[in-house]
A protein has these predicted regions:
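N-terminal leader/targeting and accessory segments in enzymes
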Residues: 1-34
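Phosphate-binding loop of NTP-binding sites
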Residues: 24, 30-126
Length: 126
């Protein structure tokens, strides 16, 4: 089963994608962020939010290497730290996750609030 959040439905979508669900919304980025925020609400584990001008990925990978021998670590893949990458990263949380490491990067003023609401960090690293 595949699921899509879209602003415009594809032509002939039910025939072209018989095993898929489509959720039509006004703003797909906003919908993805709110869905990820609700998903994050389901987990009561330590969540480390990592931000800053440089070094986010290196710090995340370093912490993952330190923690992974003793815990199941869920982390942002590669440099998924954007308005779309963060929600996709948070979707990786599952019942096996014991700690999460998520990067948050911004490209313009005001973006960090949305990322903070999605990540809901219990620990912050700048």
């Amino acid at each position: 089963m595949r699921n899509f959040v879209v602003e415009t439905l594809p032509h002939n979508y039910s025939a072209s994608y018989p095993d898929a669900n489509f959720l039509k919304v006004v703003d797909s980025r906003e919908a993805l962020q709110r869905l990820a925020e609700r998903h994050r609400d389901e987990f009561q584990i330590p969540v480390v939010g990592i931000t800053g001008s440089n070094g986010k990925t290196i710090v995340k990978e370093w912490l993952s290497q330190l923690l992974s021998p003793d815990m199941v670590v869920t982390r942002s893949p590669r440099s998924y730290n954007s308005q779309i990458g963060v929600p996709l990263s948070v979707w990786l949380l599952d019942e096996q996750s014991e700690v999460a490491l998520f990067e948050a990067g911004i490209s313009k003023p005001g973006e960090m609030q949305a990322l903070r609401d999605i990540i809901q960090p219990t620990i912050g690293v700048l």
